[in-house]
Amino acid sequence: MQTDNTKSNTNKTAKQEWGSFVFVICIALLIRILIMEPFTVPTGSMKATILENDYIFSTKYSYGYSNYSLSFFDFIPLFKGRIFAREPERGDIVVFRPPHDMSVRYIKRLIGLPGDKIQLIDDVIYINDKKIERTEVGTYISEEGIKYLKFKETLPNGRTYFSYKLAPIYGVIYNDRYGNTDVFYVPEGKYFFLGDNRDQSNDSRVNLGFVPFENFIAKAQFIWFSTKITWWDNDIGVINLVLKLKPWIESVRLNRIFRNLYNTDV
């Protein structure tokens, strides 16, 4: 027979467990909103620095906070501009909301700062009329068997990274549009972005345009997980998800897990 004391202790334990659960959820949400947030990359515009289905960890505090960087509040106009703002640097890989479609997130490399003059001539970036260092260092063959030329580029602040261009047998149709551009004058408060996959990126050269600082969400830091195929799909049903689990596990890219996105030794 259960006494009143036993019932009281049971209720107290249940309340404590529920309180602990709520506390953990609140801490997790605060971390996601203010400190770090994971993202999945669905496209190849940053290939081969970032591949499709790479899972990225990014730091929310790197540039301070705006409506767009505060998860769950990005469509609520809490305030204008940024608070605790920190200036981004050339070469940063940034997650942001594109001005033309606020329902999605883009990830690109920051090339141009406010006040800069940017142009690409024969695939070489010119910043304020000075071309950056660009050296061909080899080739890259994608998982689809497509060949890219691999270049090491160095920005004026010393930041180095790799960019990729379709080999000549693929790239002829892209040369005029992507490799030779108009002159871009970056307005105050806005930034110029490029994808590392230079011939296959919707970036500031074409449809994206300049990105306001307010639209920045986070700075991408490292890859924490990566797969060749996507497992979860709302349209395929439970049975097909189960059948897809084994090939999804087999598609894990072990060599990309915990890869630093700013490491040029790989």
Curated annotation (Swiss-Prot):
EC code(s) of this entry: 3.4.21.89
Catalytic activity, as annotated: Cleavage of hydrophobic, N-terminal signal or leader sequences from secreted and periplasmic proteins
InterPro entries registered for this protein in UniProt: LexA/Signal_pep-like_sf, Pept_S26A_signal_pept_1, Pept_S26A_signal_pept_1_CS, Pept_S26A_signal_pept_1_Lys-AS, Peptidase_S26
Keywords attached to this entry: Cell inner membrane, Cell membrane, Hydrolase, Membrane, Transmembrane, Transmembrane helix
Cellular compartments annotated: Cell inner membrane
MF-aspect GO terms: serine-type endopeptidase activity
Membrane-crossing residue ranges in chain numbering: 21-41
Coiled-coil intervals: none
Gene3D superfamilies: Umud Fragment, subunit A (2.10.109.10)
Residue intervals on the Periplasmic side: 42-266
Active site: 45, 108
Cellular component terms per the entry's GO annotation: plasma membrane
Cytoplasmic membrane side: 1-20
Family: Belongs to the peptidase S26 family.
PANTHER family: CHLOROPLAST PROCESSING PEPTIDASE, SIGNAL PEPTIDASE I
Record's protein name: Signal peptidase I
Upper taxonomic lineage: Bacteria, Pseudomonadati, Pseudomonadota, Alphaproteobacteria, Rickettsiales
Gene from which the chain derives: lepB
